[in-house]
């Protein structure tokens, strides 16, 4: 839902592997108003007059690097030592670097391209970024969101939604890191080594950098984090485009969170049958009458829904909506692992971001949560490394892992995983019934659920309300399809309470 979205070969020829995070052709997100005329001129020869021919259009935006005078690790030194080494300079990694370094902790961020623009598109609820003091990093807001449950029912959500400006957010975090004297090293990390009170990384250029704590913020595909349980994740799969179109049917003051309608598959019986069993929805951000971000999304599937299947459904949907794509500015492919077990707690490498288990198991949202939890993890790190006793080794690992995942937060996550397991059991009609009831509850509860703010008690209240106010068919779905996930949830909650 939030598109968590690195250059990728032709998506028509490639099928993603399960550990892929998300991949895009481009990283530049042009301003939807200021560059309108120049885009029309520049992309004129690449445009098309055919319905849905966006599959044949090469994205036109070019990768962009930021002009920031960051401080690099001195390569003349034989040995580089830091308190904290962060692998990756995505949103979670930079946010943690910013938060830890402001307490005087020596931080080094290692990434193959620290100044490159993030390829991801991020959508957040405006109130989430307001609470974090990051509202100035939003470049477009919609006062209302809508959910098309079916052709005959639409929900209007009075909760403003925003698109994150990747450039503004990364510049803000980088500039804070510069002020706090964070060092950067341009390389890919190949190995992580551990001694009793010190760890080190080995980079692809042979460089070794040592530190008291290594934090993996490199994303879902990382091999540095260990698990002690089978990784039975669900997968969110999506194909998205930022496109110039002749026109589109969306209201400019409304962000379309979900469109579960399937009338576009009326002449596609094969696709319709599959969509009935494993549904996908359209997510749309309209910026003006000729610029829109469109994304066909499988909310969660296991095994992973075919990426080609998602693209075929998007072709049929845009054709039905009468959307003619003139040019594709950006194209993104998203594969997010959701739910499943947490990493082994504790372990020698700390994690933040996609590999840490903080992605919302029922929705795929993560960026706002990463921004909120990085200060929490930073506090646990500073309490150990910033103390006069300088706690290191196994005690440090125990403190930081339990700082990010205390027992109450683990129990809450189990409830969200139950939500994911429920979604996996539902077909299109069951999914419609669930969201019809979900968005009718007190906004406090659905706001809190989607923003990972509810306690176990509040989640129990939400569940009882949903069951009590759902249709009889929805109740039947819960009773007949969700018994096993419910028993598993209760067992896991009991274990976490020990």
Swiss-Prot record:
The pathway is: Carotenoid biosynthesis; capsanthin biosynthesis; capsanthin from antheraxanthin: step 1/1; Carotenoid biosynthesis; capsorubin biosynthesis; capsorubin from violaxanthin: step 1/1
EC number of the protein? 5.3.99.8
Q: Where does NAD(+) bind?
A: 84-112
Localisation:
Plastid, Chromoplast
Per its UniProt entry, what is the enzyme's top EC class, as one word? isomerase
User: Which pairs are disulfide-linked?
Assistant: none
A GO molecular-function descriptor: oxidoreductase activity
- Give the signal sequence positions: none
Highest taxon of the lineage = Eukaryota
What keywords are assigned to this protein? Carotenoid biosynthesis, Chromoplast, Flavoprotein, Isomerase, NAD, Oxidoreductase, Plastid, Transit peptide
Q: What is the effect of changing residue 127 to A?
A: Reduces catalytic activity 1.5-fold
Q: Return the Gene3D superfamilies for the record.
A: FAD/NAD(P)-binding domain (3.50.50.60)
Picking any one GO biological process from the record gives: ubiquinone biosynthetic process
Q: List where the motif FLEET motif lies.
A: 293-297
Q: How is the cofactor bound?
A: Binds 1 FAD per subunit non-covalently.
Instruction: List the GO terms this entry assigns under cellular component, sorted alphabetically.
Output: chromoplast; mitochondrion
- Quaternary structure note: Monomer.
The UniProt family comment states: Belongs to the lycopene cyclase family.
Name of the featured protein: Capsanthin/capsorubin synthase, chromoplastic
User: Can you name the source organism?
Assistant: Capsicum annuum (Capsicum pepper)
């Amino acid at each position: 839902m939030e598109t968590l979205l690195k250059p990728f070969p032709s998506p028509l020829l490639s099928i993603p592997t399960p550990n892929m995070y998300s991949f895009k052709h481009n990283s530049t997100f042009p301003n939807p108003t200021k560059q309108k005329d120049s885009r029309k001129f520049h992309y004129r020869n690449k445009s098309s007059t055919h319905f849905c021919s966006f599959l044949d259009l090469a994205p036109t935006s070019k990768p962009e690097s930021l002009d920031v005078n960051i401080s690099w690790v001195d390569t003349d030194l034989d040995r580089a030592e830091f308190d904290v080494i962060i692998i990756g300079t995505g949103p979670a990694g930079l946010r943690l670097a910013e938060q830890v370094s402001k307490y005087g902790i020596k931080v080094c961020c290692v990434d193959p391209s620290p100044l490159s623009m993030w390829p991801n598109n991020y959508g957040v609820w405006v109130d989430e970024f307001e609470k974090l003091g990051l509202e100035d990093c939003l470049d477009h807001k919609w006062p209302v969101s809508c959910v098309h449950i079916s052709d005959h029912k639409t929900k209007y959500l009075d909760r403003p939604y925003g698109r994150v400006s990747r450039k503004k957010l990364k510049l803000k975090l980088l500039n804070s890191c510069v002020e706090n004297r964070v060092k950067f090293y341009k390389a890919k990390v190949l190995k992580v080594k551990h001694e009793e009170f010190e760890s080190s990384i080995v980079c692809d250029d042979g460089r070794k950098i040592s530190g008291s704590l290594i934090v993996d913020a490199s994303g879902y595909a990382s091999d540095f984090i260990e698990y002690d349980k089978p990784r039975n994740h669900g997968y969110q799969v999506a194909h998205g485009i930022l496109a110039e179109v002749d026109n589109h049917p969306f209201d400019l003051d409304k962000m379309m969170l979900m469109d579960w309608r399937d009338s576009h598959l009326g002449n596609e019986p094969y696709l319709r049958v599959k969509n009935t069993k494993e549904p996908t929805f359209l997510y749309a951000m309209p910026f003006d009458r000729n610029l829109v971000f469109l994304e066909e999304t499988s909310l969660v599937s296991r095994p992973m829904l075919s990426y080609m299947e998602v693209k075929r459904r998007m072709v049929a949907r845009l054709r039905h909506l009468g959307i003619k794509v003139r040019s594709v500015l950006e194209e993104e492919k998203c594969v997010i692992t959701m739910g499943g077990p947490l990493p082994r707690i504790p372990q020698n490498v700390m994690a933040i971001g996609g590999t840490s288990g903080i992605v919302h198991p029922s929705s795929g949202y993560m960026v706002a949560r990463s921004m909120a939890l990085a200060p929490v993890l930073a506090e646990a790190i500073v309490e150990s490394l910033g103390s006069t006793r300088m706690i290191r080794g196994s005690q440090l690992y125990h403190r930081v892992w339990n700082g990010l995942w205390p027992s109450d937060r683990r129990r809450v996550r189990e409830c969200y995983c139950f939500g994911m397991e429920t979604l996996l059991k539902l077909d299109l009609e069951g999914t419609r019934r669930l969201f019809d009831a979900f968005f009718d509850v007190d906004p406090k509860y659905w706001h809190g659920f989607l923003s990972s703010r509810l306690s176990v008690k509040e989640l129990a209240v939400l569940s009882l309300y949903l069951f009590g106010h759902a249709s009889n068919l929805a109740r039947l779905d819960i009773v007949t399809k969700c018994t096993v996930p419910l028993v598993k949830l209760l067992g896991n909650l009991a274990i976490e309470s020990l």
